[in-house]
Amino acid sequence: MLVLLCATMASQAIAAPVITFYRKQGESYVDCRITMKNGTTNFKHSSNSCSNDDDYYFSISGAEDGVQFGIYNNPDCKENESFATYKTGKGDSNRNIRITAVDASRGLPAGHLIHDTLMSGGRDKSGQLHGKVSCLKVWNAPLSTEDNAAQ
């Protein structure tokens, strides 16, 4: 019985959510996609495909309940410049969270529903964030199928 349960749970393993960043023009101008694993992605000083200081919007595919993330002006995800934080639910029926302004959560209390189970993380700092995105920080992300295979 235990073997069957483990096999069933393994077959239901999830892929990590993916966040897509968009430039000023919106959905038809994708800048980059990042797998949402715990840690930070510095747009300015790393080899990822994201442009520094060019993004205005984001969307998420494969959303998972409880993943938290912040979008920062500071390239090291420090809170000394403008930033906004979020927490995800499972998204719509297809586990997607539609296109959202990078600063949509600012000024909202923690847990405030923005749309599609996307909530405010309750922490932010004022100042221009749209067109100034330099870092993504993710925490509370579940282990994906790839992470489990590496262990």
Predicted regions and their residues:
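Compact beta-sheet-dominated domain cores in extracellular/mature segments
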Residues: A13-Q151
